[in-house]
Amino acid sequence: MRIGLFGGSFDPIHLGHLLAASQAQEVLCLDRVLFVVAARPPHKVPVAPAEARYEMTLLAVAEDPRFTVSRLELDRPGPSYTVDTLREARRLFPQDELFFITGADAYRDVLTWKEGERLPEYATLVAVARPGYPLEEAPLPVVPLFVPEVGISSTEIRRRLKEGRSVRYWVPRAVEVYIEKHGLYR
């Protein structure tokens, strides 16, 4: 099988993430895409708790059989290091072809990650292209993934929510309801 591991903090997950996952599944002919929610990312501090981000991601992908959500990082103590996640994924899926998918902005700093230079040993690296982050300058070989630009970011969603503005059509409806119910990002 060909499995995509889509890593991110998903704080919150939004339609741009889902579009990227769908594009990756189609372009890379993936049998499934696992969303790997970063529990404790070492390079940034999430706003929402890890379990809330996990639950929102579950809600976002619930109706798409191509997508599942993994607890690989949530159930492991300590910081969420990508190399540890990919090692564990390789152990769980020894016969499968793995693809690690994340934004091009993250890859520019990949060599500062714990054992970042070893990531290609465990999975093919796939970078979702973003304006301002040229992939030809990536420090490791990556497969570029071009996704229609939607101009949605988790940062902008959090800002809108803090200002009391709507995020309808930015996140799946179930995620919007969850955010409202739990008073996140206010």
Curated annotation (Swiss-Prot):
Domain of life: Bacteria
Pathway: Cofactor biosynthesis; NAD(+) biosynthesis; deamido-NAD(+) from nicotinate D-ribonucleotide: step 1/1
Entry-linked SUPFAM superfamilies: Nucleotidylyl transferase
Spans traversing the lipid bilayer: none
GO molecular function, one term: nicotinate-nucleotide adenylyltransferase activity
Reaction(s) the record says it catalyses: nicotinate beta-D-ribonucleotide + ATP + H(+) = deamido-NAD(+) + diphosphate
EC number annotated for this UniProt entry: 2.7.7.18
Enzyme class: transferase
GO biological process, one term: NAD biosynthetic process
Protein keywords: ATP-binding, NAD, Nucleotide-binding, Nucleotidyltransferase, Pyridine nucleotide biosynthesis, Transferase
Family classification: Belongs to the NadD family.
HAMAP family reported for this sequence: NaMN_adenylyltr (MF_00244)
Role summary: Catalyzes the reversible adenylation of nicotinate mononucleotide (NaMN) to nicotinic acid adenine dinucleotide (NaAD).
Official protein name in the record: Probable nicotinate-nucleotide adenylyltransferase
